[in-house]
Amino acid sequence: MSYIRYIKQTRPNTAVAFFSPSVEVIAKLDVYKASGKIESYTLDTISTNQLNKEIKIVFNSLDSFDEFMTEELIIASATKRGEYCAENFISYSLEDDLI
């Protein structure tokens, strides 16, 4: 079964930049994708009003997701995302789905 992680951000206006993953995080996503642990990912799905952004990562299993989430780089990125969003009045949510 696949495991999907959604990261959704809502910004107050278009003058505020969304938080985006670093080059290093994208490289880590690519490593997991090359190994088959990530089936696909999209990083920049933007709503028509330009105020909402969705990141979607499809893992091949819950175990692969759990492994990914223990990576120091990913933990640090999650901390940076939380800080950035708080400083810039961006609300965000994490949603998971098992399919």
Residue ranges and their predicted role:
Residues F65-E67, E72-A76, K80-E83:
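Short, compact, well-ordered microdomains
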